[in-house]
Amino acid sequence: MASIEFSPGIQEVPTQVRVLKSKTGNRGSAIFRFEDLKSDTQNILGMRMIDEEGELTTRNIRAKFLNGEFKALEVTYDMETEAEWDRFLRFMERFSAANQMGMA
């Protein structure tokens, strides 16, 4: 089963995922938005995407605040090669199936 974690053993589900690919097709990014976190937001250092193939990680995390109140985390996962892109898509297929997520 595929999962996303900020803290070991605490699975999270994003509110939104946007996937972007360059016009040349060489680079891509996935931007995850998390509004309702189970993890302690004070101790988040990175995001792990885990499935049967292994683990994908990123430390590109930004907290969003409104009037001093936490609203969301935005996490960016960058892909530099076609192999990284394909691996990410395989993870997202597994993750979306496990969490009843669809594409809009």
Curated annotation (Swiss-Prot):
Family: Belongs to the Psb28 family.
The protein's name in its UniProt record: Photosystem II reaction center Psb28 protein
Keyword Manganese: no
Keywords: Membrane, Photosynthesis, Photosystem II, Thylakoid
Chief localization: membrane
Protein topology in the membrane: Peripheral membrane protein
InterPro entries assigned to the protein according to its UniProt record, in alphabetical order: Psb28_c1_sf, PSII_Psb28_class-1
Residue stretches in coiled coil: none
Gene: psb28
Domain of life of the source: Bacteria
Any Gene Ontology biological process: photosynthesis
GO (cellular component) term, any one: plasma membrane-derived thylakoid membrane
Alphabetized HAMAP family for the sequence: PSII_Psb28
Cited Gene3D superfamilies: Photosystem II Psb28
Subunit: Part of the photosystem II complex.
Disulfide bond residue pairs: none
Compartments where found: Cellular thylakoid membrane
